[in-house]
Amino acid sequence: MIKRALISVFDKTGILDLAKFLESRDVEIISTGGTYKHLKENGVKVIDIEEVTGFPEMLDGRVKTLNPLIHGGILAIRDNEEHMKVIEEKGINPIDMVVVNLYPFFNKVEENLSFDEKVEFIDIGGPTMIRAAAKNFKDVVVLTDTKDYENVIDEIKENDQVNIKTRKKLAGKVFNLMSAYDAAISNFLLEEEYPEYLTLSYKKNMDLRYGENPHQTAAYYTSTVGKYPMKNFEKLNGKELSYNNIKDMDIAWKTVCEFEEVACCALKHNTPCGVAIGDTVQEVYTKAYECDPISIFGGIVAFNRKVDKETAENLAKIFLEIVVAPDFDEDALEVLKNKKNLRVIKCEEKSTEGKDMAKVDGGILVQKSDNKLLEDTKVVTEKSPTEQEMKDLIFGMKVVKYVKSNAIVVVKDGMAKGIGGGQVNRIWAAKEALDRAGDGIVLASDAFFPFGDVAEEAAKWGIKAIIQPGGSIRDEESIKVCDEKGISMVFTGIRHFKH
């Protein structure tokens, strides 16, 4: 039975209802600082923690609850006679419930504050209390999540106590929270690319209907710190997002964020099927659609500019899973909302430089994101590309980095007309891209040509210019073919494998 509770919260959501309920059950409430003031001002009978400890708050609030008279009351095991004898001798009263939420370090670390100001939001007393309460969960109920208040109130109403299963779960939530909290602090202080221990701080954003396939359970977690596109987007319409939706949306958004020009990316199964740049959203959508009018069906379309009504009307003509853009004209949004299942996503955050992670069985691979497009660009053939061809070559290289290797993209006038990817050899990827394009001006490759066969195949289809990293021991073979066929070729020095 709960006789004494300690309440100290930064987030005051729901705390009055909980405190007044406890008061109605004759529970003695101890509190600190701002929480004490808030409860007292709202008519709750509450004891200042200084009355319990006999020691005033000190060091600008850094020391409030760090006292044996508090922690002895939390940690004492009730059915341990020696424990109870000791706390009685020391004048310590047991504390049966601890309600604490922490200083909002997750949020403050991203604000425009000085380093020292951010450090002040590293909570010490709160974590110490909740860890102590969680360790002694058989005797102490610990609440760190405002969403748990109602359930605990209901259990006490029904049973006069909180059952052991709930206590254990609440204790588990403490250490789950502290892992994320400590991870965020560790990463803030270390500032290391690859620390000795990889600690990640993510919070569940939503449960998903299923994973990649219906038999796989899934959930979506987002970073507790920082601003990221796939964390800060807003869903304006449509069904709940699926596991595959989020993965696809991420790649589609990253693709359009590559471009300063107005850009559109149509994507299916995590691979672009049509990408285009131009002067207006309507133009780039039309061009992206024409790249592959079959594969776009049931796919995702992303823009890096606001969507207008005319474009929305064209988008509404076909079945799409998602449309994502920085914004939508009001009348464009009304058009898209007529398709109740279409997920309309507003995403204003640009794709960020960061880390890529891939889970393997028993480990995690971590690498810098592929944010470097070119190194030392040089023409290696007798013929040089024209100005327009060079623009298309750079465009193609920006697209090919988002296609699964081996990858080839064929481009004409700012359109990725043919995309070939996921092949185990480069010539197959080239044949796939060239065949899909039908016609094209330039060809981009994510990695070097191991033989001259890709250049030979490109010549058959009338390709005028090629861009690739270079670096093969047989580079001269490809250069020779290009010179013989009148094709210009540019080496970039940067490979863009995507596995």
UniProtKB/Swiss-Prot annotation:
PANTHER family: BIFUNCTIONAL PURINE BIOSYNTHESIS PROTEIN ATIC, BIFUNCTIONAL PURINE BIOSYNTHESIS PROTEIN PURH
Pfam families in the record: AICARFT_IMPCHas (PF01808), MGS (PF02142)
Functional pathway: Purine metabolism; IMP biosynthesis via de novo pathway; 5-formamido-1-(5-phospho-D-ribosyl)imidazole-4-carboxamide from 5-amino-1-(5-phospho-D-ribosyl)imidazole-4-carboxamide (10-formyl THF route): step 1/1; Purine metabolism; IMP biosynthesis via de novo pathway; IMP from 5-formamido-1-(5-phospho-D-ribosyl)imidazole-4-carboxamide: step 1/1
Domain MGS-like: 1-144
The encoding gene: purH
Free-text note on domains in this protein's UniProt record: The IMP cyclohydrolase activity resides in the N-terminal region.
GO cellular component, one term: cytosol
InterPro entries the record matches: AICAR_Tfase_dup_dom_sf, Cytidine_deaminase-like, MGS-like_dom, MGS-like_dom_sf, PurH-like
Biological processes annotated in GO: 'de novo' IMP biosynthetic process
Family (UniProt): Belongs to the PurH family.
Key words, A-Z: Hydrolase, Multifunctional enzyme, Purine biosynthesis, Transferase
EC number: 2.1.2.3, 3.5.4.10
Protein's UniProt name: Bifunctional purine biosynthesis protein PurH
